[in-house]
């Protein structure tokens, strides 16, 4: 997959639809952090100067459908206002959101728009943009994005793993690595990718949990097709990690 060509295509389409309203387009996630695989997704934040009307939102969704070929997990993007990027709000309001979860609804209902509300996940995404993001188009990250409070980031990453006990049995690789990078941040203050969190946990965690993390890492890098599901081991791992995360969170922010 030619990701450079794909990113150029994305930028061209966003510029064409949004015109002068587009402040910038920013890459976060695995592709920004140097650990992209074809099994991952492409993660984008777009920043606009003023609110978008529904016709413009729909036009951008239609252009998004034309982007490809995409990696296995597709493309996820959110659009926020410049004023909110600069003066951070949590949970963050957003103008428009697209991910494969919404694709079928967007295709079936041209009046459907995911936007005009708030998203607790965005604090985590914006922190990655701040610390490790890549400018695809527009103003620099330093010009556009204000500081993200540690408390908001922690709330966001813990919200993301809120259903980990059940989720790890359905999506063991991603939930395992999300738990790893969450604990990595709480212990070390490192805004890490999934795979970086996995590598750290293989050295940090008790030996009992090494096989679960090792399998997740192997699945992520593609050395095994998928992570095996051992309900007992995965459940014990999730319980251990959630307890460790809760302890570290309490020590950092007292909640």
For the regions a protein language model found, what residue spans apply to each?
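Helical scaffold of the NTase/Pol beta-like nucleotidyltransferase catalytic core
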Residues: 1-26, 55-57, 61, 255
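Catalytic metal-binding acidic patch
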Residues: 25-29, 33-64, 74-82
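Extended, basic/helix-rich recognition subdomains
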Residues: 155-216
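Structured mid-to-C-terminal alpha-helical surface segments
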Residues: 190-255
């Amino acid at each position: 997959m030619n990701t450079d060509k794909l990113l150029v295509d994305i930028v061209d389409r966003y510029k064409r639809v949004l015109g002068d309203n587009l402040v910038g387009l920013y890459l976060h996630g695995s592709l920004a952090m140097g650990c992209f695989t074809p099994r991952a997704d492409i993660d984008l934040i777009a920043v606009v100067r003023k609110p978008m009307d529904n016709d413009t939102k729909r036009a951008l969704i239609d252009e998004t459908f034309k982007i490809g070929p995409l990696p296995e997990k597709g493309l996820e993007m959110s659009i926020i206002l410049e004023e909110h990027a600069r003066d951070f709000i949590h949970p963050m309001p957003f103008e428009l959101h697209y991910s494969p979860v919404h694709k079928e609804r967007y295709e079936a209902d041209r009046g459907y728009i995911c936007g005009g509300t708030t998203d607790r996940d965005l604090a985590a995404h914006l922190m990655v943009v701040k610390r490790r993001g890549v400018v695809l188009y527009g103003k620099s990250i330093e010009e556009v994005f204000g500081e993200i409070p540690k408390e908001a980031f922690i709330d966001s990453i813990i919200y993301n793993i809120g259903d980990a006990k059940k989720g790890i049995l359905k999506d063991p690789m991603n939930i395992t690595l999300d738990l790893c990078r969450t604990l990595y941040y709480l212990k070390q203050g490192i805004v890490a990718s999934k795979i970086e969190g996995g590598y750290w946990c293989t050295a940090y965690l008790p030996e009992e949990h090494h096989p679960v993390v090792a399998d997740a890492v192997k699945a992520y890098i593609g050395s095994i097709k998928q992570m095996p599901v051992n309900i007992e081991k995965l459940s014990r791992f999730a319980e251990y990690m959630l307890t460790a995360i809760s302890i570290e969170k309490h020590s950092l922010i007292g909640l």
